[in-house]
């Protein structure tokens, strides 16, 4: 299934993500220069999130250009964030003008790929299936991606050739 996800919005998936599902966020722009305006938070942060039916953020992927970091976390609904896990941002996207973030939902972890190359495995902290995705930015900042992302949900069983 394909969905359009606008900056500062949340979209319901057509159905909850099934076991071994894959979500691909695609942009037609990449700007890795830090946002000139840090706004009230003081942190250059754009993020995409996988959210369950209860409103828990199962996986938060923050792009913090000024800190040269991808930040991974989980956020139980109405509670504080857990400890951040980080990897360097520099060099992950290469020269691509159509960047993508792909998340493969394994039973115990998320495999995170940037431009279809695995960069991190994030151990699941919260239960539930992804039913929504969001694309957010801190107030007053410019995003590294286009204002609209394409979101594709797929499964290996549907894309792998099968022998007869």
UniProtKB/Swiss-Prot annotation:
Keyword Ribonucleoprotein attributed: no
GO cellular component: extracellular region
Subcellular location: Secreted, Extracellular space, Extracellular matrix; Secreted, Cell wall
Record InterPro entries: ConA-like_dom_sf (IPR013320), Galectin_CRD (IPR001079)
Binding site for a carbohydrate: 45, 64, 73, 81, 84, 138
Consequence recorded when altering residue 138 to A: Abolishes chitooligosaccharide binding
MF terms in GO: carbohydrate binding
Alphabetical list of Pfam families matching this protein: Gal-bind_lectin
PROSITE patterns, per the entry: GALECTIN
The protein's assembly and partners: Homotetramer. Oligomerization is required for carbohydrate binding.
Function of the protein: Binds complex carbohydrates, such as chitooligosaccharides. Does not bind lactose. May play a role in fruiting body formation.
Name of protein: Galectin-3
Species: Coprinopsis cinerea (Inky cap fungus)
Taxon lineage: Eukaryota, Fungi, Dikarya, Basidiomycota, Agaricomycotina
Gene from which the chain derives: Cgl3
């Amino acid at each position: 299934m394909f969905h359009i996800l606008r900056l500062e919005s949340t979209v319901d998936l057509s159905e909850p993500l099934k076991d071994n599902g894959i979500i691909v966020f695609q942009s037609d722009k990449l700007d890795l220069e830090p946002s000139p305006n840090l706004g009230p938070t003081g942190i250059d942060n754009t993020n995409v999130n996988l959210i369950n039916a209860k409103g828990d953020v199962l996986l938060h992927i923050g792009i913090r250009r000024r800190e040269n970091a991808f930040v991974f976390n989980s956020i139980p609904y109405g509670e504080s964030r857990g400890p951040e896990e980080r990897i360097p941002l520099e060099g992950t996207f290469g020269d691509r003008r159509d960047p993508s973030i792909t998340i493969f939902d394994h039973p115990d972890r998320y495999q995170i790929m940037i431009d279809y190359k695995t960069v991190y495995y994030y151990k699941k902290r919260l239960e539930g299936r992804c039913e929504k995705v969001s694309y957010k930015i801190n107030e007053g900042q410019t995003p590294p991606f286009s204002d609209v992302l394409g979101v594709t949900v797929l499964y290996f069983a549907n894309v792998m050739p099968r022998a007869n």
